[in-house]
Amino acid sequence: MGRNSLCPCGSGRKFKKCCASKAQEIGNFPIQFLKSELIRKYKIRFKTPEDINGIRKAGRLALDSLDMAESIIRPGITTEEINTVVHEFTAKNNAISAPLNYRGYPKSVCVSVNEVICHGIPGSRILRDGDIVNVDVTPILNGYYADANKTFFVGTPGPDAQRIVDITRECLRQGMSMIKPGNTTGHIGWAIQSYAESHGCSVVREFVGHGIGFEFHEPPQILHYGQKGDGFLLLPGMVFTIEPMINIGARFLRILEDKWTAVTNDGRLSAQFEQTILVTENGYESLTPFD
């Protein structure tokens, strides 16, 4: 393709006056051209500074919701009580809980205890000393979505609980450390899988991270396993979640009769942490930052 050819981004302009004029490049391709290809082929929706600010505000509300949940977690409460507190807090802040009625999900929050990997439906289950409990929140604030979750200790954790939570939190950090323009989603998955398996744990493969911001789930999918170079190229303006689910035993799972709750097949512990991430010009920014 010559510089006087029509730009392949579809603008109708000559390449030299369109994508070739952009200063930033990855692999000899202008970033704007690479973005246009991802938009055209995979419907990835890049975010403007205004969008990012809106998602960041929703992200702050997500973190405040998790803090609210943490403040009541103790032995003796039910998972339904966590749902009620977060639902009311979200509504009080003029936001909507995205999970409620999403594809038929009946609650505002996912609350997953011990062997529950994800999508635990809040109800009458009572938290007990030594449990671990994941709380997953997704507020919609002024039309923007943000997604975050944490796994909390209930009372005093045992050795296995401490181990799986520490390893899972570090898996998220390892995945985030791979985020920069020019890397791929496969770099993220590789880092998570490598760390988990090197510590004798396994990565759940049936559930993935995802684009977010304008909708609850957008392209691309972010696998928590894989190889460097696999998947989609990371480019500035992408916003997606990383949410590794790590099992202390085997990675296999089953879905309960409610058609939502995923549990470890061997009944052993599973933990998860999640943040909403923006790819920046030089790396990344968490829009739901926590340690």
Spans of features found by a protein language model:
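Short Cys/His-rich zinc-binding micro-motifs
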Residues: 1-16, 20
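Active-site neighborhoods and metal-handling regions in enzymes and metal-associated proteins
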Residues: 11-13, 22-291
